[in-house]
């Protein structure tokens, strides 16, 4: 069936060995489609009456996504390729709900939650604001409502873009987001601050990202679109481990070939979902997204290259090799590569990262260095519950600077776990996994953060 599908979409005809390798990846090496995400524009739903607006977005989401679950289940059964999550992303709510009152934004989040449940999807993203150069009244109303919105919903995810290479870093927004994260943790304290696992702060956020918590349907996107995220750390790790005393060039070539196969499979699934739903196919996100399962780990790939433990000296170089090889292999396989496309390093979602933190080899500072060469940023990191809002903002500012200067996407998804200290851990379950509490600096950044203003765009932003 995989061979037939490849021919159907005009791909090269794979050999019998390649087909068997793909089947092996699915059955034994945790290869799957991590997410099929439907992006839906809500721009035509805007209305000053909150009741009408909520009715509009509920109707739009549920009508557009009504066949998503059935269709993906059929394709999963047809091809034998697991599809782990079905998700929805929508137009940033701060734009669609600009005319709503402050007290209306939580009701919008609840409506999104109800629509996601009706559609049967796992998450819905887009409770978002883009404030890299300043905030509108709608942006501020949304940002201030995030803690209550995430505490009172199950499936809603939120993101805020506070920096771009072209605009610089909005430090007023960075300072505000530290407080929002603290408040979100407090309102979900009984669940180890899980609300913060559904909130991400971005620099250079992509408009077509299929992964949560950062997915939103950008204003340059079509009416409705299908974006797909693949997953394959286990397959890449197995391929590297099977090499006999390779040099790093040989490791890179092997990763490229594996990424090529993973990408072909993902594009095949995405295009078939789009065809059956009558919706435009958008992008394929190449990101290697780990899970807490043993063997499905980005850290394990780095250790297979020769590192005793992820986080030791050489880790950043190994991650750069991995990220580059994944992109090269994926770009050869598809003309629809987009989103984040690289390697994720979420601590709580990667068994190898968790062990590295526990062993003391992986620190917050080393993770920050690693984010300069990989797909996203400081992801799913748990810190002590008494971490100040200013310290959280300073961590965000550092990560935004990495993204702005290097002209890449970076992000922070951090959990100040209420009542927890270094040595403790938090348990979220499922794909979110668990995380040991990591220490932060005991020195204050408060005066710096409170200065506010905007860190200007770097000289490399002048590209015209």
Swiss-Prot record:
Pfam families from the UniProt entry: DUF711 (PF05167)
Disulphide bridges: none
InterPro entries referenced in this protein's UniProt entry, alphabetically: UPF0210
HAMAP family: UPF0210
Gene3D superfamilies (UniProt xref): 3.20.70.20
Name this protein carries in UniProt: UPF0210 protein MA_1691
Family named by the database record: Belongs to the UPF0210 family.
Organism of origin: Methanosarcina acetivorans (strain ATCC 35395 / DSM 2834 / JCM 12185 / C2A)
């Amino acid at each position: 069936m995989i061979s037939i599908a490849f021919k159907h979409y005009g791909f090269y005809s794979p050999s019998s060995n390649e087909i068997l390798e793909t089947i092996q990846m699915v059955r034994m090496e945790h290869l799957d489609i991590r997410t099929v995400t439907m992006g839906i524009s809500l721009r035509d739903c805007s209305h000053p009456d909150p009741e009408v607006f909520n009715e509009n977005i509920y109707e739009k989401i549920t009508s557009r996504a009504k066949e998503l679950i059935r269709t993906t289940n059929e394709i999963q059964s047809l091809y034998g390729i697991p599809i782990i999550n079905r998700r929805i992303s929508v137009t940033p709510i701060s734009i669609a709900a600009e005319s709503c009152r402050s007290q209306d934004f939580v009701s919008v989040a609840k409506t999104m939650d109800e629509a996601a449940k009706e559609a049967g999807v796992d998450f819905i993203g887009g409770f978002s604001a883009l404030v890299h150069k300043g905030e509108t009244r709608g942006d501020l109303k949304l940002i201030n409502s995030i803690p209550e919105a995430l505490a009172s919903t199950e499936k809603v995810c939120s993101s805020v873009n506070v920096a771009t290479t072209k605009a610089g870093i909005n430090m007023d927004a960075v300072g505000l987001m530290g407080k929002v994260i603290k408040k979100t943790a407090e309102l979900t304290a009984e669940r180890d601050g899980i609300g913060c696992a559904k909130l991400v702060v971005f620099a250079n956020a992509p408009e077509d990202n299929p992964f949560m918590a950062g997915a939103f349907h950008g204003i340059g996107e079509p009416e409705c679109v299908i974006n797909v995220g693949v997953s394959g750390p286990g397959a890449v790790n197995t391929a590297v481990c099977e090499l006999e005393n390779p040099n790093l060039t040989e490791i890179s070539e092997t990763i490229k070939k594996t990424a090529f196969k993973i990408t072909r499979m993902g594009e095949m699934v995405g295009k078939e979902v789009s065809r059956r739903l009558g919706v435009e196919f958008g992008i394929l996100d190449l990101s290697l997204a780990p899970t807490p399962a043993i063997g499905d780990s980005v850290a394990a790939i780095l250790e297979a290259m020769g590192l005793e433990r992820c986080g030791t000296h050489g880790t950043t170089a190994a991650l750069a090799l991995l990220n580059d090889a994944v992109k090269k292999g994926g770009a050869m396989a598809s003309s629809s590569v987009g989103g984040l496309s690289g390697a994720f390093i979420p601590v709580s979602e990667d068994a190898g990262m968790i062990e590295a933190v526990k062993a003391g080899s992986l620190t917050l500072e080393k993770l920050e260095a690693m984010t300069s060469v990989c797909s996203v940023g400081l992801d799913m990191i748990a810190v002590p519950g008494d971490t100040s809002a200013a310290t959280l903002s300073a961590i965000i500012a550092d990560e935004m600077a990495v993204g702005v200067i290097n002209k890449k996407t970076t992000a922070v998804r951090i959990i100040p776990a209420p009542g927890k200290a270094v040595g403790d851990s938090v348990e979220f379950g499922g794909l979110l996994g668990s995380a040991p509490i990591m220490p932060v600096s005991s020195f204050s950044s408060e005066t710096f953060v409170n200065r506010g203003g905007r860190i200007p765009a770097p000289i490399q932003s002048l590209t015209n």
